[in-house]
């Protein structure tokens, strides 16, 4: 079992990161733009080095993101299965407009993401 990792003390970026079953869940928080994406990129790189399974990004506390996040998710997807939970109308629209909704699946819970991503992986 891999350990939980805390990031950013609840600020913008990755506020929590931990293994849940056979997936790793990273909670993103705040307004992710150029000023804060490096936090997400570094946290993801750490997880990719330490954990062999799928990554699930929890977006429930994300108030803004731009195409940098979509690019990051697609880059991560080339290395591991990726799923999203806690999307909102803004995120759903961003995925639709960028044509990435089909390759970045959304789920109702970490458990649903785990079931689908471990079956697909």
Regions of interest found by a model, annotated:
Residues 103-112:
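Short acidic-hydrophobic, aromatic-tinged amphipathic segments that line or gate anion-handling sites
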Residues 2-45, 61:
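STAS-typified acidic loop motif
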Residues 111-121:
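A charged, well-structured terminal subsegment
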Residues 34-104:
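Amphipathic alpha-helical interaction surfaces in cytosolic regulatory modules
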């Amino acid at each position: 079992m891999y350990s939980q990792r805390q990031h950013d003390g609840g600020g913008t970026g990755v506020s929590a990161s931990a293994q849940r079953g056979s997936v790793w869940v990273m909670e993103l928080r705040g307004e992710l733009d150029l000023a804060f994406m490096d936090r997400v990129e570094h946290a993801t790189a750490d997880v990719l080095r330490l954990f062999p399974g799928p990554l699930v990004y929890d977006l429930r506390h994300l108030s803004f993101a731009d195409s940098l996040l979509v690019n990051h998710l697609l880059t991560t997807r080339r290395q591991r299965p990726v799923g999203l939970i806690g999307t909102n109308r803004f995120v759903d629209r961003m995925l639709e407009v960028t044509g990435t909704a089909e390759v970045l699946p959304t789920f109702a819970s970490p458990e649903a993401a785990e079931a689908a991503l471990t079956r697909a992986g």
